[in-house]
Amino acid sequence: MAVPKRKTSPSRRGMRRSADALKQPTYVEDKDSGELRRPHHLDLKTGMYRGRQILKPKTAEV
């Protein structure tokens, strides 16, 4: 069975666990529509990304 040679200090343990925290996602306001969206992601309502039409905008089906 593997046994550690040295005791892990609280500082080293905390540095190891520092990457485990959940971070709140960031949002930016879209220049064209004014809606909030994730940075470097396309706007799902309009289908635009960096001024280009990537996806067809969704139309309301009756």
From Swiss-Prot:
Residues 1-16 have a biased composition (Basic residues). The keyword Phosphoprotein does not apply. The keyword Ribosomal protein applies. GO terms for molecular function: structural constituent of ribosome. Residues 1-62 are annotated as: Disordered. Keywords: Ribonucleoprotein, Ribosomal protein. Residues 28-44 have a biased composition (Basic and acidic residues). Disulfide bonds: none annotated. GO terms for cellular component: large ribosomal subunit. One of its GO terms (biological process) is translation. It comes from the Bacteria. Belongs to the bacterial ribosomal protein bL32 family. This is Large ribosomal subunit protein bL32. It comes from Azorhizobium caulinodans (strain ATCC 43989 / DSM 5975 / JCM 20966 / LMG 6465 / NBRC 14845 / NCIMB 13405 / ORS 571). The lineage of its organism: Bacteria, Pseudomonadati, Pseudomonadota, Alphaproteobacteria, Hyphomicrobiales.
